[in-house]
UniProtKB/Swiss-Prot annotation:
Protein name, per record: Xylose isomerase
Lineage top rank: taxon: Bacteria
Disulfide-bonded cysteines: none
Organism for this UniProt entry: Brucella suis (strain ATCC 23445 / NCTC 10510)
Catalytic activity, reaction form: alpha-D-xylose = alpha-D-xylulofuranose
Residues the entry annotates as binding Mg(2+) 2: E267, H270, D306, D308
Binding note for cofactor: Binds 2 magnesium ions per subunit.
Recorded coiled-coil stretches: none
Record-listed E.C. numbers: 5.3.1.5
GO BP field: D-xylose metabolic process
Location of the protein in the cell: Cytoplasm
Any single GO CC term annotated in Swiss-Prot or TrEMBL for this entry: cytoplasm
């Protein structure tokens, strides 16, 4: 049954690259076979409940710009929001969605009321998933918006806040499991510090390690089969966040013995804030064996902060999905659009148009990445660049020779290496041919 919010807009269909219909896919064809698998199953698109239905269009200099009938802290408004959200999911045709607890329920007076509200909405989600075929990619707890978390959740100096946050995560894992969620995400927006003058760094890291260990322990206790994911971000809202980037998260996981239990959910915008490319973070996660899922968006190239815009740069997406394919593709993860409308984009159809453009951009990137992989366009030059290490001397350097033996061979054989071109321009031109 239609809520009327989207008017007479019909379900979005694939019409091909020649279509000029703004409410149709030009490149995302869910059933198209890419590398032996349906495009839908490669990309595993998800809609973010928070940006799509909870964000009000405000910024640091101005308040709400969006006029949505569900903007109130009442359970009936939350139910209307759920109706509109699932209508949107059905119109768009993305197979998954993601949510924080605070996105979907009103803020209660205490933990018990929050839990009751959440369970009431989960009852509704269960029915709607059965009716629509929608699936939950991941759930998470909002441990950063409420003022109780101003000094962190897992890293808060007050043990009562730690306990409240842990109890909240428990209820959110329960909800995620009940809805068949395939992952559970932890993002530490307030896990960090504004100044070291009032921060016990060692204690806070240990507390965060304890918190994550509790999550993993509970996952196994209740038989939740999904993947636990950490989402790295270097700053914003906190000046310095402990889950700075993939490398930092990996070091943290190793320190607390959790590297085989937890993977990463990598967001493009967060990678940029950390001084990396999206491609870099994906490649490193793949190399370290902790790649899990992605939050797809982009930052404004000029502003220098996390703007969460819909992706529109196909070469960037081609290189990103190239790394995803090298990792073997998604298992429990997927492509969640952690992207929001601009605050002047007021019309309901803008929400569809933003997602359609993002899905088309990702589809083009995936197809380009698949062709590069099939043709060996990047792997062949890479193999040539490192070919010397496959020879007898290269193998001995890595496994048999001591430092003094290496020095002896360099002198005896008069080894005098000359640099070879890295061919960066050639490789960049190859990528552009495929996109």
């Amino acid at each position: 049954m239609s809520t009327g919010f989207f008017g007479d807009i019909q379900k979005v269909r694939y019409e091909g690259p020649e279509s000029d219909n703004l409410l149709a896919f030009r490149h995302y064809n869910a059933d198209e076979i890419v590398l032996g698998k349906r495009m839908q199953d490669h990309l595993r698109f998800a809609v973010a409940y928070w940006h799509s239905f909870a964000w009000e269009g405000g910024d640091p200099f101005g308040g709400r710009t969006f006029d949505r009938p569900w903007f109130s802290n009442e359970i009936d408004a939350a139910k209307l929001k759920a109706d509109v959200a699932f209508e949107f999911f059905s119109l768009l045709g993305a197979p998954y969605y993601c949510f924080h607890d605070a996105d979907v329920r009103p803020e209660g007076r205490n933990f018990a009321e929050n839990t009751r509200y959440l369970n009431e909405i989960v009852d509704i989600f269960e029915k709607k998933q059965a009716e629509t075929g929608m699936k939950l990619l991941w759930g998470t707890a909002n441990l950063f918006s409420n003022r109780r978390y101003m000094a962190g959740a897992a890293t808060n100096p007050d043990p009562d806040v730690f306990a409240f946050a842990a109890a909240t995560v428990k209820t959110c894992i329960d909800a995620t499991k009940r809805l068949g969620g395939e992952n559970y995400v932890l993002w530490g927006g307030r896990e960090g510090y504004e100044t070291l003058l009032n921060t016990d760094l060692s204690r806070e890291l240990d507390h965060m390690g304890r918190f994550l260990s509790l999550v993993v322990e509970y996952k196994h206790k209740i038989g939740f089969k999904g993947t636990i994911l950490i989402e790295p971000k270097p700053q914003e809202p906190t000046k310095h966040q402990y889950d700075y980037d993939v490398a930092t998260v990996y070091g943290f996981l190793k320190r607390y013995g959790l590297e085989n239990e937890v993977k990463v959910n990598i967001e493009q915008g967060h990678a940029i804030l950390a001084g990396h490319s999206f491609e870099h973070e994906l490649a490193l996660a793949r190399t370290l064996g902790i790649f899990g899922s992605i939050d797809m968006n982009r930052n404004d190239y000029q502003s220098g902060w996390d703007t969460d815009q819909f992706p529109n740069n196909v070469p960037e997406k081609a290189l990103a999905y190239y790394q995803v394919l090298l990792a073997g593709g998604f298992t429990t993860g997927g492509t969640n659009f952690d992207a929001k409308l601009r605050r002047q984009s007021l019309d309901p159809q803008d929400l569809l148009i933003g997602h359609i453009g993002g899905m088309d951009c990702c589809a083009r990137g995936l197809k380009a990445a698949a062709r590069m992989l099939e043709d060996g366009a990047l792997s062949k030059p890479l193999d040539e660049r490192y070919a010397g290490w496959n020879g007898e001397f290269g193998k001995r350097l890595l496994s048999g020779l001591s430092l003094d033996q290496i020095a002896g061979e360099v002198e005896a054989k008069d080894i005098n290496p000359q640099p070879k071109s890295g061919r960066q321009e050639y490789l960049e031109n190859i990528v552009n041919r495929y996109v």
